A protein has these predicted regions:
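A helix-boundary/hinge signal
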Residues: 1-436
């Protein structure tokens, strides 16, 4: 038993009657920290420790970047989900978990120093079709998960906690408001002033000057049935409307005269699912609405190539591989020229497309497939540009095979380059085509 603002003698009587133990706040219930005050930092640190314990330790450096990305995406990120659903966690908690996730992804350790991240973390946490690795943004995921409480409050008003203030982020409440529309039946479970029930719009948007004259308490409590009964909505208006408000009032009056309540329950629809039912997954995606897409995502992630090869090409597209041009910008040791041709400056675009030995390599692997016409030329703008133009020239049933071949080819070129730079291996790149 956990007494809340209860006299000690009363608590003792109840304890003796129920024959149960007594504890106090803060405590843990069903794995969650709960308190009658704001949670302390120490109450949440245990969750960060749980995440750190899950790191595979000495095995991590032996894993590829793609392997670590899978662990971050499906294991480490999943640990705080239960907490994010129930509690609006502070930003320091998100930053602490992200520090662990980021460090493990790039270096396989719990902590790293600056300069180890090849791609900005905000970009990594985007969905794969928007240019990221599909690792969830914890803050946005928390908003999406907590939106389920707003949905349950709307669709299941008989729950014991219904009517209580739900501590959700303003972004969560704002998205929920514009994403749910209602088909009115008896009007018992639809808010008159704020819900989108009138031809898919809310009165807040249809008549903003009238809405300003409604007290906040009535905005959150007045149902459609109550408002239409004896024109109660008219008496909700406080103060002078002004001439714009008067025009909106008359238009609203005309629209409401056509509303007839039915003897059925109100039906609420979530617009981001075909079924009309809410899901946290669709809510998470909705927070990225309007974002710029990542054009080659299907070519890359839907191919048959191994994950480590696809992750490398993802870095290539973002120009985040440690070639000579990037090493030079940071004042690090670097080869003066391309390790393959020894004529031009090494960039990732030159290495994969315009280098004379690279072009010969692509010709060799494409010729047996009668696709030698697609081999890159010395005038190619970039690796991605050549890939995209070549992909479009193929019939649809050949595109997936071609994408896989390009990704594997790029991986072999990079491995050959590293063997030459770090191991002094001087074998010809053309001979590596047999590895495919």
């Amino acid at each position: 038993m956990i007494p809340i603002h209860c006299d000690g003698e009363v608590a003792e009587v109840v304890n003796n009657t129920l024959q149960c133990s007594t504890t106090s706040f803060p405590t843990t219930y069903l794995g969650l920290p709960i308190s009658d005050r704001k949670l302390r930092r120490s109450d949440l640190l245990i969750w960060i420790e749980k995440i750190a314990i899950k790191l595979p330790g000495w095995k991590a450096p032996l894993m590829s970047l793609a392997g670590r990305a899978v662990l971050v995406r499906y294991v480490i990120t999943a640990i705080p989900i239960y907490l994010l659903i129930a509690i609006r966690v502070p930003k320091w908690f998100i930053r602490a978990v992200d520090k662990i996730r980021k460090s493990f992804l790039w270096k396989g350790r719990k902590e790293i120093n600056g300069g180890s991240c090849l791609v900005a973390w905000e970009k990594v946490m985007r969905p794969i079709d928007l240019g990221g690795l599909g690792i969830h943004n914890l803050e946005i995921m928390g908003w999406a998960l907590q939106m389920c409480w707003l949905w349950f409050e709307k669709t299941k008003p008989d729950r014991p906690w219904a009517g209580l203030e739900i501590p959700v982020h303003p972004n969560t409440a704002a998205l929920f408001t514009v994403s749910v529309f209602t088909t009115v039946g008896n009007g018992h479970n639809t808010l008159f002033w704020t819900d989108r029930w009138l031809h898919g719009c809310s009165i807040e948007n249809l008549a903003p000057n009238v809405f300003k004259c409604i007290p906040a308490r009535l905005r959150k409590s007045r149902t459609v049935r109550e408002a239409l009964l004896d024109l109660t909505w008219v008496s909700d208006i406080r103060g002078a409307l002004g001439w714009l408000g008067l025009v909106e009032y008359l238009e609203l009056w005309d629209v409401l005269t056509d509303v007839v309540l039915q003897d059925t329950e109100d039906i609420h629809h979530w617009k981001f699912e075909a079924s009309g039912l809410f899901s946290s997954r669709s809510a998470y995606r909705a927070f990225f609405a309007g974002s710029v897409g990542f054009e080659p995502w299907k070519q890359l992630w839907k191919s048959w190539a191994p994950s480590k090869c696809k992750t490398f090409v993802w870095l290539t597209i973002r120009n985040r591989c440690w070639t000579a041009d990037r090493l030079q910008k940071r004042g690090l040791p670097h080869p003066d020229c391309c390790p393959l041709c020894d004529h031009e400056e090494e960039t990732i675009q030159h290495l994969l497309t315009t280098c004379v030995f690279t072009r010969q390599f692509w010709f060799n692997i494409l010729q047996p497939l009668n696709l030698s016409r697609l081999a890159p030329r010395h005038t190619a703008n970039s690796f991605v540009d050549w890939w995209r133009k070549s992909w479009k020239k193929l019939q649809k049933h050949l595109r997936k095979e071609f994408n896989s071949l390009v990704i594997l080819g790029a991986w072999i070129i990079w491995k050959h380059r590293n063997a030459r730079v770090f191991d002094g291996n001087n074998t010809k790149l053309a001979g590596s085509s047999s590895n495919l």
